[in-house]
């Protein structure tokens, strides 16, 4: 099953679109981490190997909460710290036949998109959540997974998560 940005958007809209807002960051950031795990768990690598685990997702909620709980001089600093937290998490993405994952190419893109997202208030939580999901999808799609399809001899592959 491929990565479906609409499913991530729907989960994030459910998290952020509350009648009274979200005054406490901890449960919100934990839910964002769960939504990202759910999104990534639909991914397969270019060798056809399905998602197996992403152990970094358990720390992602805490890392995002730490970013949102501290006082930052600007939204740009918080956005870059969040991008690093997502990068740390995605670096633990595993599929059944994977040998390595490279997430570095997408980090500047994610940082830039999150800086844009956090640089000014959005007219609604829905627009914010959709932009957040789009940024995470664009970032995740740039990760490159390499692995070996079992066989004699094994067949190497390299490509993006889809």
Regions from the language model: what does each represent?
Residues 1-162:
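Extracellular "spike/adhesin" assembly and maturation modules
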């Amino acid at each position: 099953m491929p990565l479906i940005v609409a499913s991530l958007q729907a989960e994030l809209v459910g998290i952020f679109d509350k009648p009274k807002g979200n005054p406490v960051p901890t449960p919100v950031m934990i839910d964002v981490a769960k939504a990202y795990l759910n999104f990534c768990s639909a991914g397969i690598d270019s060798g056809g190997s399905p998602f197996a685990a992403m152990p970094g997702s358990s720390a992602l909620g805490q890392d995002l909460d730490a970013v949102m709980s501290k006082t930052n001089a600007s939204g740009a600093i918080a956005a870059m710290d969040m991008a690093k937290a997502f990068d740390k998490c995605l670096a633990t993405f595993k599929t059944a036949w994977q040998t390595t994952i490279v997430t570095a190419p997408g980090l500047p893109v994610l940082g830039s998109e999150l800086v844009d997202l956090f640089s000014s208030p959005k007219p609604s939580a829905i627009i914010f959540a959709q932009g957040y999901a789009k940024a995470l999808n664009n970032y995740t799609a740039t990760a490159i997974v390499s692995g070996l399809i079992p066989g004699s001899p094994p067949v190497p592959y390299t490509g993006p998560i889809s």
